[in-house]
Amino acid sequence: MSAFDRIGVVGAGAWGTALANVAARAGRAVKLWSRDPAQVAEMAARRENARGLPGIALEAGVTPTADLREAAACEAVLLVVPAQVCRAVSGELAPLLAAGTPLVSCAKGIERGTAAFMTDVIRAAAPAARPMVLSGPSFADDVARGLPTAVTLAGEDGALAETLAAALGSSTFRLYHSSDVRGVEIGGAAKNVLAIAAGIVAGRRLGASAGAALTARGFAELQRFGRAFGAQPDTLTGLSGLGDLILTAGGPQSRNFAFGLALGQTGEVPQGGKLAEGAFTASALVAMAAGRGVEMPICAAVDAVLSGRLSVDGAIEALMARPQRAEA
């Protein structure tokens, strides 16, 4: 089996740049792709991605490129683009990839309109690739600076996931391998919506007690959803589930928390700014839950606020007015 000496990273935002540095620290030759030739030239000249991750030097093993073929020719490709453009970019990669190339989704979301998880999107758009997913509690800045981080890499072929995890791991970036692809994807998608709710609680200054209750009850929703879609319990309580929820719901370094914080402070849905995947995932997540009879009141409240059906205060009141019940 390939040792994965060459790694392609498609997407030169903050997370893509951080993962490119991760792979280079592990001794891999990395092609970091951006669609923008000017950004590529700037990264090559400055050895820094000033647009995506300023202040962090690119590792020596990272080669920026605007040629998608160079990234696609690598032995494994990390797809580090927003969830809602995963299908389009996977389609661009499809004719360039060798059959069986691992194509690893590093986005945390569900496609709007289709309610498809990212590995399903990859499977449809790039059928010759081997879909995988990388997820877990990780801020790009922490990872890029070499601070200790642990994540999960999942693929249907557990041996392949183990081999690729070993190829990307280092003394500061630990990858646990898994074959529970769906469980890892569910944790990454659901926690973003719950982090928006946590940000709203902070923005409304509802207190630490409310924040703790929100996180605990939100995790109960994540578990119910996961069970309904066949996730393994250990995955949901692991890095890609509970671990990522704790990180993302913990403060404004999280884009989704920051989005919710602004929403809670102003009562208005933020426009522009950094991408918050949870804002796009909420409606799909809630619809999927309803289709399986899964109760997710916190996520449904976030969706109602984002769609304008409820005000922030109205959503809080509705949650607190729910009938008393046993904890489960």
Curated annotation (Swiss-Prot):
SUPFAM superfamilies registered for this protein in UniProt: 6-phosphogluconate dehydrogenase C-terminal domain-like (SSF48179), NAD(P)-binding Rossmann-fold domains (SSF51735)
Predominant subcellular localization, coarse grouping: cytoplasm
Record NCBIfam families: PRK00094.1-2, PRK00094.1-4
Pathway noted in the entry: Membrane lipid metabolism; glycerophospholipid metabolism
Gene that encodes it: gpsA
Keywords recorded for this protein, A-Z: Cytoplasm, Lipid biosynthesis, Lipid metabolism, NAD, NADP, Nucleotide-binding, Oxidoreductase, Phospholipid biosynthesis, Phospholipid metabolism
Catalytic reaction annotation: sn-glycerol 3-phosphate + NAD(+) = dihydroxyacetone phosphate + NADH + H(+); sn-glycerol 3-phosphate + NADP(+) = dihydroxyacetone phosphate + NADPH + H(+)
Entry EC no(s): 1.1.1.94
Protein name in UniProt: Glycerol-3-phosphate dehydrogenase [NAD(P)+]
Source organism: Azorhizobium caulinodans (strain ATCC 43989 / DSM 5975 / JCM 20966 / LMG 6465 / NBRC 14845 / NCIMB 13405 / ORS 571)
Annotated compartments: Cytoplasm
EC category: oxidoreductase
BP GO annotations: carbohydrate metabolic process; glycerol-3-phosphate biosynthetic process; glycerol-3-phosphate catabolic process; glycerophospholipid metabolic process; phospholipid biosynthetic process
GO MF annotation terms: glycerol-3-phosphate dehydrogenase [NAD(P)+] activity; NAD binding
Gene3D superfamilies: N-(1-d-carboxylethyl)-l-norvaline Dehydrogenase, domain 2, NAD(P)-binding Rossmann-like Domain
Oxidoreductase found in the keyword field: yes
Pfam families xrefs: NAD_Gly3P_dh_C, NAD_Gly3P_dh_N
Function: Catalyzes the reduction of the glycolytic intermediate dihydroxyacetone phosphate (DHAP) to sn-glycerol 3-phosphate (G3P), the key precursor for phospholipid synthesis.
Residues binding NADPH, per UniProt: 15, 35, 108, 140, 255, 275, 277
Top-level taxonomic group: Bacteria
Gene Ontology annotations for the cellular component aspect, listed alphabetically: cytosol
UniProt-annotated binding residues for sn-glycerol 3-phosphate: 108, 136, 138, 191, 244, 254-256
